[in-house]
Amino acid sequence: MRANLAQSIGVASAAALLLPLAPLVPAAALSPSAAAPSARSAPSSPAVPGHTQSLSFDESPKPSAGPRAPGEKDAAVRVVSARTVRPYSLLGVVWDRADQPLRGRVEVRARDADTGRWSEWQQLEAHASGAGSADEGGRARGATAPLWVGPSDGVEARVLPESATAGVSLPGGLRLELVDPGPGEQSGAAQPPGEPKTAEPDRGPGPDKAPDPEKAPGTDTGAGSGSAPDTGTEPATGGEPQTGSDPQTGSETGSGDGAMSGQNETGAVLPELTREATETEYQTGGSFVGPRPRIVTRRGWGANEKLREPGHAYTKTVKAAFVHHTAMSNSYKCSKAPSIIRAMYRYHVKSSKWRDIGYNFLIDKCGTIYEGRSGGVAKAVRGAHTYGFNTDTTGIAVLGSFDKTKPPQRAVDAIARLTAWKLGLFGVDPAGRTWLKSGGGKFKKGRKIRFHTVSGHKDGYVTECPGARLYGKLDSIRTAAAHLQGR
């Protein structure tokens, strides 16, 4: 459902689910020659695996005058006609300027490369106007959240007016981006856990895993919105992010000083640590910090470091975690998670012009945790995940859609383990609340808003992300994470 996308990326609408494929157009109906002249492929240099195809939108044929028939769809104002394309697995729409809104609904459908069947139309959610423009160096494009569709060789897209009577003023440079993640740079990551039989596994984690958030002891913080009225005494807010080429420079940390650890992140996997080993590794001095969970590093999922901008952006501390979902099909295999993450990384950097992937961490349905944005998993790395609240926060995205589908217990447990450790490094109680200063978006810029220290994307931005079913798990996640910290 990058970081400023905050809205991003995490956006969630039931329409964004990958629906069962239905044969709408036979594969033979489209051939490579069907590609419109305006389509251009932009493969990467041979030195950078993967490629991106960029297709321009054409004006839709003018609809006939008169009222539309009952149930007839609104006429599209821009289209990418159905065509055969080079193989790809993820798509999204971009335009020239991030400060220009997309006043229309973008719908896409993809043709399965194996079966030749077309998916149903799926809606893409556009990031807020201005998202990413300041935080990502000022060159960010306007963009929708990306959608993973799996191996595909055909595509069709359309932009529909917001209402039947509304005129449409579209931003310049509107293009459909088709991303092939390519092979990973490394293949040293450990094999992921076995696939859950369904999106709702009936077994919890083993004894060496985090306790079940539904049964963990602790005090319930109560349901409700992640933000409370901004009344009362407010603590001073953190400063602006610092930038430096070395993670050890240009950053200030809060209590716990997680950024000062010298852990080695050059391998494919950071192994799980006991609580005692975590305290020794990160020199937490016996404070409340959960044991470090197993984390697949960027090397482990095959990140090509030539894609992203050099250097890193840091904030002073980490005061809260925002939970997202990626609003994609839940039917993927966990062994494909590295490919999905590589595709998102390429889309955020090459298509949206962000400095790096937007999320700080990603979690697949098997509960495997992946490092996201570069800069150090224990450091206060500024991401692009929750527009208006990327300062002093970390963004965690679960691969899948959880508006109507129950999130797998292994993924829920992984969020608890990750937040117990990450927030603990900075002295934060995952069952507590904190004040954050808005950078714009859902709340007026400069306004101080009170959040749960583990909040959903929808608490900080106008979106349904992380989906109603995952959002409903946040209370139990907070309780479990606090228990893992020894509170």
What is each of the regions a protein language model found here?
Residues P101-V106, R355:
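Short coil-to-beta strand junction motifs in C2/discoidin
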Residues L19-F57:
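C-terminal region of N-terminal signal peptides and the immediate post-cleavage residues
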Residues L307, K316-S351:
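Active-site acidic/histidine clusters and adjacent loop/turn architecture
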Residues P87-Q100, A157:
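A short beta-strand element within beta-rich, extracytoplasmic domains
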Residues R2-A6, S13, L24, V168-T326, ...:
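Basic/polar, cationic surfaces and motifs that engage anionic cell-wall
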Residues D58-E72, D96-P101, R111-D114, A128, ...:
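Primarily mature extracellular domains of secreted and cell-surface proteins
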Residues V11, P26-L30, G50-S56, E72-P87, ...:
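Beta-sandwich interaction modules
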